């Protein structure tokens, strides 16, 4: 079972992002405040769950959470400020949108840009340790998946329905064959070192 809180006396929000390692699409983040007595044995790091489980848990989280919100940073913004800062900004935007103001933030990972007037604790692999971070990981992942599925309808050749923008062979081959889209992150190594050689011959 995951831990329900770090400090029982504080209103804590768990924060996580999705899409940091992708070649295309926005980065999404979520912030979730759960009730202190929240329990769910299935709730875990989104990467450990099936797609069906993630969407079922999203309904539970949205129904039972004290507050939840999603923040988004576009590919254009990612290219301007870099993906690390974009991940922090997405989390800040999610916290901005919470209807209940948290007193403490639990952040998945080992780095974070301080949010104004709210202390935080970074937790490596926090989505496998704290319920609120796991809940945030599920919301960020599922809402970003929905977004990439919509983009797939516009640009089906990149297989975003399956790879969600991550650097698969099929995705990189499509970039080499069809070029980029407005949704690709132009500051990323889109073809990969090995494939750059392959397609330049």
UniProtKB/Swiss-Prot annotation:
Enzyme Commission no: 3.1.26.4
- InterPro entries from the entry? RNase_HII, RNase_HII/HIII, RNase_HII/HIII_dom, RNaseH-like_sf, RNaseH_sf
Compartments in which it is found: Cytoplasm
Specify the domain of life of the species encoding this protein.
Answer: Bacteria
Principal place where this protein is found?
Answer: cytoplasm
Q: Which UniProt keywords apply?
A: Cytoplasm, Endonuclease, Hydrolase, Manganese, Metal-binding, Nuclease
The free-text cofactor remark is: Manganese or magnesium. Binds 1 divalent metal ion per monomer in the absence of substrate. May bind a second metal ion after substrate binding.
PROSITE patterns in UniProt: RNASE_H_2 (PS51975)
**What name has this protein been given in UniProt?**
Ribonuclease HII
């Amino acid at each position: 079972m995951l831990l329900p809180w770090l400090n029982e006396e504080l209103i804590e929000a768990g924060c996580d992002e999705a899409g940091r390692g992708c070649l295309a699409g926005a980065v999404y983040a979520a912030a979730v405040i759960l009730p202190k007595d929240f329990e769910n044995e299935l709730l875990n790091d989104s990467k450990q769950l099936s797609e069906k489980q993630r969407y079922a848990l999203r309904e539970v989280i949205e129904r039972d959470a004290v507050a939840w919100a999603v923040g988004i940073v576009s590919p254009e913004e990612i290219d301007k400020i870099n993906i690390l800062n974009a991940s922090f900004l997405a989390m800040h935007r999610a916290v901005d949108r919470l209807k209940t103001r948290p007193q403490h933030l639990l952040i998945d990972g080992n780095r974070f840009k301080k949010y104004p007037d709210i202390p935080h604790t970074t937790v490596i692999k926090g989505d496998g340790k704290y319920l609120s971070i796991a809940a945030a990981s599920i919301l960020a992942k599922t809402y970003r998946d929905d977004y990439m599925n919509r983009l797939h309808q516009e640009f089906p050749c990149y297989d975003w329905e399956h790879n969600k923008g991550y650097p698969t062979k099929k995705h990189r081959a499509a970039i080499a064959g069809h070029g980029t889209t407005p949704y690709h992150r132009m500051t990323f190594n889109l073809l990969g070192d090995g494939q750059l050689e392959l397609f330049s011959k």
